[in-house]
């Protein structure tokens, strides 16, 4: 069966945590445009869905998310959980509570619920040995999740995300997006992974990778995500002449 044949069948139900964030919302919106996949969102509170969304939403406390996953039995969990330094009150422990402990806990709960595959949204520069707090936390999360034992683990490391947020754009981030087109061409090739990337491309990549079944651990930089996003579009867009 080809990927296009697969897309013509019933949508694959993919679980998602982090639906209120930029990537999570784009995953819901983009998946709703085709019949390749359907998002089953799990959140702590009700949320307003993007216009035209076709998805299921479960509202439950985080300690019950594993039970939801066990009931849904998706082939893949997409984890886009994350907070900001500002929302965390510029407190390291508060930041770790969401970006590290909650991420690892839900990943473990998914594995315990027999969800075989995980797509994790991390960040460019993630490194457990980094002197930078943010990069170090992301690297530690990647290391912990890698040890859980998923059949397939996809780790996405996007650079600065471009896309509409819900009134939560930090000043430095806004400036970065404005000046990125001018600065990025001047950066050495080794910093290409830090370049900005459209949130839609990351969401498309996450959806496409969530449908893959080959076992293993795979880390995706901006270029790899763009390729995966292209594969998703090829999967869902009608063939020329259809």
Regions from the PLM with identified roles:
Residues 1-9:
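A short, basic/flexible loop-to-alpha-helix module at the beginning of a structural domain
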Residues 9-34:
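N-terminal Rossmann NAD(P)H-binding glycine-rich loop of SDR-like oxidoreductase domains
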Residues 14, 55-105, 109-112:
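NAD(P)H-binding glycine-rich loop region in Rossmannoid oxidoreductase-like domains
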Residues 17, 42, 80-81, 118-124, ...:
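SDR active-site strand-loop-helix element
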Residues 22, 89-140, 147, 151-154:
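Conserved Rossmann-fold NAD(P)-dependent oxidoreductase catalytic core, especially the SDR/UDP-sugar
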Residues 26, 30, 109, 144:
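Rossmann-fold NAD(P)-dependent oxidoreductase module
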Residues 34, 128-236:
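Oxidoreductase cofactor-interface core, primarily capturing Rossmann-like NAD(P)-dependent enzymes
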Residues 42-46, 61:
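N-terminal Rossmann-fold cofactor-binding loop
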């Amino acid at each position: 069966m080809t990927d296009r044949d697969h897309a013509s069948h019933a949508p694959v139900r993919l679980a998602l945590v982090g639906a209120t964030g930029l990537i999570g919302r784009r995953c819901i919106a983009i998946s709703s445009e085709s019949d390749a996949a359907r998002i089953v969102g799990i959140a702590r509170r009700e949320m307003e869905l993007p216009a035209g969304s076709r998805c299921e939403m479960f509202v439950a406390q985080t300690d019950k998310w594993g039970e939801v996953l066990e009931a849904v039995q998706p082939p893949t969990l997409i984890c886009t959980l994350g907070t900001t330094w500002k929302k965390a009150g510029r407190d390291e422990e508060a930041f770790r509570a969401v970006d590290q402990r909650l991420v690892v806990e839900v990943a473990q709960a998914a594995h315990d619920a027999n969800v075989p595959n995980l797509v994790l949204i991390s960040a460019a520069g993630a490194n457990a040995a980094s002197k930078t707090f943010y990069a170090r936390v992301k690297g530690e999360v990647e290391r912990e999740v890698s040890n859980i034992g998923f059949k397939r683990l996809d780790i996405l490391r996007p650079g600065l995300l471009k896309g509409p947020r819900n009134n939560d754009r930090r000043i430095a981030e806004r400036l970065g997006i404005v000046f990125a087109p001018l600065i990025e061409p001047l950066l050495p090739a080794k910093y290409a992974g830090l370049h900005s990337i459209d949130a839609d491309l990351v969401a498309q990549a996450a959806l496409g990778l969530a449908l893959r079944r080959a076992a293993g651990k795979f880390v995706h930089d901006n270029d790899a995500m763009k390729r995966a996003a292209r594969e998703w579009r090829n999967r869902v867009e009608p063939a020329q002449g259809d």
